[in-house]
Amino acid sequence: MQAARKRWPPSVAFWSPSPKHYVRVDRDSLRETRRLASSLRRNALAARVARVKAGMLRAELGNLSQLQIAHAHGVLADLARLEQATALHVAGDGRGSGNPPTSPGQGHPLSWGNSDSHGGGGGPGGGGGGELLITISPDGPTFSVKDDFRTEFISGLYTRQSQWLPFYGPWYAAMTDSAMQRRVFPKELKGNVNFQNSTSLKLMTGLLEVLASATEDFYTDGRNLSDVNAALCLLNGYYCLRTPAPLPSTYGELLADLDKKMEFLIADLKRDASNTDFSFAFSNPRQLETVAPLNRQGAYAPDFFGRHKMFAVMSDAGMFPNTKQTAASAQDPGARDIVYLITNAVFGENVPPFITYQLNLRTGLKALELLIVVYIVLENAHVQHNTVNRRLQLPALLGDQYKRPAAQRPQPQQPAAMFKKGFLFSFVVKNYMVPVLTRRPQTPASSLFPGAVLLALETADAASAGGGSGQTLGGHLINLSGKKYDQLFDVLNQKLTFRDVQGLIGAQTALRLTLERGLNLLLSKPSPLTSATEVISTQFGGGDDYDSLYFLILGCLPVTMAVV
């Protein structure tokens, strides 16, 4: 019997050598497969890059189309104004006018006349031809402005650089030196003038623009009001709540009697004896990174306004009937939100109540603080005819533009009126603030008074250098670090060098928070007027009330310096 063949298990049979088990490797096939895979990968990457480029091109073309549409709207508006001017010119010729009217833009930027006779420039709308007429000093000139007063005034100081250059005082001299020594600084702001004991035009206009936009809101929400408009609503609401005055229903009524309303509010703030100041409570450190509320509902933390003096005074008066502070003591259960009634009548239904959307409340309170600083500086100020100690000499700065016929010289004010308390502030309100706000209602408070912004920033810097209180052991502080300009230069670098939107928002937020802190420190001092006057005198060279007045509006006090 033949012995049975031994059968191996399948696992062993699989691994046992056999001519049937082999692997054939085709080198050409592998090379072709690798080539096809590489080609497919390159095509996929090229398609992705093409899609990204197409998206970027689509976005760029969209931006260009929006710019072209805006430019077309501007051209159409200019054509409409030209058509209206032509119609008026033809109508004037039809009535027997011998010569065509002269365009205001072809004359000198200064027009002369009695300041009180025209209320600061031909009414709130400004002069003809789209120009704005403003008057700053009772015995000074009336300025005809096309776009921005500071830019046009400063630009006119560099027309005779072969003879003299403007010098702006110790603060700006130190700022210029610090800017020229920095490694990271916009190249377009550096010039030879900065090394001639002066400051270049581009650097001055750039820095003044940063100061003027310190309180400008960069949010595009329709619920936002400019800080000045929010302050006007708060001021009018408080005045109407405490007096029999009717609620304003138009923007013109909102601007009426601003000097009286400011005086009324400041008088109540002086009578308030509570242990409060003008600061906000930042219980959440993240709130220091943004001006807008962290809460998406638009409200800050419950204790955010808890120690703010102005909010407490307004809240105790019943301006915010929905707050817990007034709910317990309100005598009228049906109390109205008087601020909302004003915003609804003047600005429309898109603006929610301030106590609900609290960004408007915060910016409005700080704008009121800035106006209070202006009021304090000008409350007892009066313009003297003696100019010996005066730094700002308009005849020397403006030259032939300052000359006018003797028949057009302004008549002097009555002494009793000029020495009246609050006269200069009332004059500035009627002849500067009201025309500018009527022409451009969205103007921020920092653009109206950049000098007040500088006062607050200097106060905050002195407090930081003095360990938080502004006091030093020697009684006199000399700051050689140059850190006071860091935040201003940071905004300039983000705008012109890095061009980073998020970085720019962060820099503007840091500057605004410093401004808020400085306003609180300045208004909390025993004598804010003394502190403000000292800053104007030591840092910017101010000599009298006339200099203080122009400093608040210009943000600088230039003098002529001969070129050697």
Curated annotation (Swiss-Prot):
Residues 1-45 are annotated as: Interaction with major capsid protein/MCP. Its main location: virion. The keyword Oxidoreductase does not apply. InterPro entries: Herpes_UL25. Heterodimerizes with CVC1. Interacts with major capsid protein/MCP and triplex capsid protein 1/TRX1 at the pentamer vertices. Interacts with the large tegument protein/LTP. Capsid vertex-specific component that plays a role during viral DNA encapsidation, assuring correct genome cleavage and presumably stabilizing capsids that contain full-length viral genomes. Participates in the interaction between the capsid and the tegument through interaction with the large tegument protein/LTP. Belongs to the herpesviridae CVC2 protein family. This is Capsid vertex component 2. The gene is CVC2.
